[in-house]
Amino acid sequence: MDSCHKIDYGLYALEILAQYHNVSVNPEEIKHRFDTDGTGLGLTSWLLAAKSLELKVKQVKKTIDRLNFISLPALVWREDGRHFILTKVSKEANRYLIFDLEQRNPRVLEQSEFEALYQGHIILIASRSSVAGKLAKFDFTWFIPAIIKYRRIFIETLVVSVFLQLFALITPLFFQVVMDKVLVHRGFSTLNVITVALSVVVVFEIILSGLRTYIFAHSTSRIDVELGAKLFRHLLALPISYFESRRVGDTVARVRELDQIRNFLTGQALTSVLDLLFSFIFFAVMWYYSPKLTLVILFSLPCYAAWSVFISPILRRRLDDKFSRNADNQSFLVESVTAINTIKAMAVSPQMTNIWDKQLAGYVAAGFKVTVLATIGQQGIQLIQKTVMIINLWLGAHLVISGDLSIGQLIAFNMLAGQIVAPVIRLAQIWQDFQQVGISVTRLGDVLNSPTESYHGKLALPEINGDITFRNIRFRYKPDSPVILDNINLSIKQGEVIGIVGRSGSGKSTLTKLIQRFYIPENGQVLIDGHDLALADPNWLRRQVGVVLQDNVLLNRSIIDNISLANPGMSVEKVIYAAKLAGAHDFISELREGYNTIVGEQGAGLSGGQRQRIAIARALVNNPKILIFDEATSALDYESEHIIMRNMHKICKGRTVIIIAHRLSTVKNADRIIVMEKGKIVEQGKHKELLSEPESLYSYLYQLQSD
């Protein structure tokens, strides 16, 4: 118990959960406000503290078998103060992934272990932004506000549909009159009148039908544009972690699902629904003609529905399998094209072709299964339709023979029945499209329902100076992954040049990703000029931080467009000055088109060293106050590197510079060198100071490179 009083696990849990929801928290302030007696946060004070951070919290009692239905992560509250965070529940394996606040590590518990710790009290946590996100999630209900927005257009479509249905009602009546009156009484004058009237009806029906299609296509195209624009904006606003945890081809396949939704919106499905809504009027007229024949039609409708419901789940599973295989093909194709140099260099084209053939065969087989099942579904619909037609023919003929129905009435009845059955059959036949759209909406929802980087309510602060502070930083990429950064405390002064070295996987690049606010630390704060980056607008921050990576991507544009990417209106003089600092001006001037040279896709028209120098110029052109070189010179030839190092004084002047390097000669002139090992800072000092310690890690690495 004493250890519980020394460490307030409730406060620690609040800090972790707040960071998870991108909410900044100052533990000392929370402790001062809510832990008035110094014994730690009790349940009531913990709930008040969480609400003060604009978190939505709710204490509930749940039995263990209901835990897989709650939103995670959640805090499991214990009376002895040894709380823990529940992050995942696997009911199939009867295992529970928790974050142990005492050991500060994730743990997997078996059912019996969890039962021994769980006391039935759990606190559900959500940020207000996440609650709003759930209310605005993308599914079929997303289209309701869009329909309301364009309600005038849809009302016009509805009005046109009413007139079309009235014309559809009049036409059978004309045929009835012709059969029962004109033919019997040889009324040629009446026939002429009916023919003219029917011609007018047909002309108006064609015009209104075309008008309805135009209005409907126009409105759905607007919705399509809005959805497409929303999708791309949302995609670019997603955090780096989203893209790092998914294959490129999988993301592309999900985005392409927009085509399926587009085809559905502009197809016949929705107009068929409108036509079906007017069936009640036709039923009333048909009932007037013959209740018996009408009952046959009525009883056939549940048969259509039952058959579609029976086919649907099987069809959906097969469509899902088809999509998954298509996503695998997309991923493999993107990977193969991206790695074409490696594939050719290693002469592994036959192996890659073999893999592609197998995957393609699997996709084609999945598509064939979908086609077969869809065909079975359509033939089942046709069987019901033909059966109803035969029954109506037999029963209708009996009614005509017995004098209960005239020939004209039978023909009119069948025409009216066709107006009811036709949209039903169309809907049943396009049920496959609806199933596909349902999967498309779900897949697209994976993109649109993923939380974006939080911009709203974040602070856009004045121009930064360049002071950087890491305070008690602890970070891991996933709750169940190893710790990448552990207890990092580091202060970097404005204008200081810092070198960061260490073995691969020691956390060097991760440290700079926290500066760019690509991730929020699990524990601790990253401060720039004393401002917590968890509260800062990411765009405001990144505009003032220049980053050069080991492998930079150039866009398929001109060199000047690539350098001035963040500010297209920048003067040519500034672009040239940045290119000179980066040692790129000379080779650019030798190109035929100079700065207007198109670099090709991902800069394929340039050498690796040339691409790197353009990337350095791109990072310098906006005069950032913080400049990060993450193995930026490792791909340069010695001459290009010499030019960069010669200009390093000008490059570093007036800005804070962080240089990550494996080549220690790159950082030996830095104001301070940070040595990292297994996520911790183990040494720091100037080049000569670190070498003066022969047993230091820096000396060891330097000796290896000297040899």
From Swiss-Prot:
From the Swiss-Prot or TrEMBL record, what is one GO molecular function term?
Answer: ABC-type oligopeptide transporter activity
Occurrences of domain ABC transporter (ranges): 468-703
Keyword check for Cell membrane? yes
Q: Where in the cell is it found?
A: Cell inner membrane
Show the SUPFAM superfamilies listed in the entry: ABC transporter transmembrane region, P-loop containing nucleoside triphosphate hydrolases
What Gene3D superfamilies does the database record attribute to this sequence? ABC transporter type 1, transmembrane domain (1.20.1560.10), Cysteine proteinases (3.90.70.10), P-loop containing nucleotide triphosphate hydrolases (3.40.50.300)
Q: How does it sit in the membrane?
A: Multi-pass membrane protein
* Additional notes on this entry: The complex HlyBD-TolC (OMF) forms a single transport channel across the two membranes, allowing direct export of alpha-hemolysin. These channel is involved in type 1 secretion system.
**Recorded family membership:** Belongs to the ABC transporter superfamily. Protein-1 exporter (TC 3.A.1.109) family.
State the protein's name: Alpha-hemolysin translocation ATP-binding protein HlyB
- Read off the lineage from the record: Bacteria, Pseudomonadati, Pseudomonadota, Gammaproteobacteria, Enterobacterales
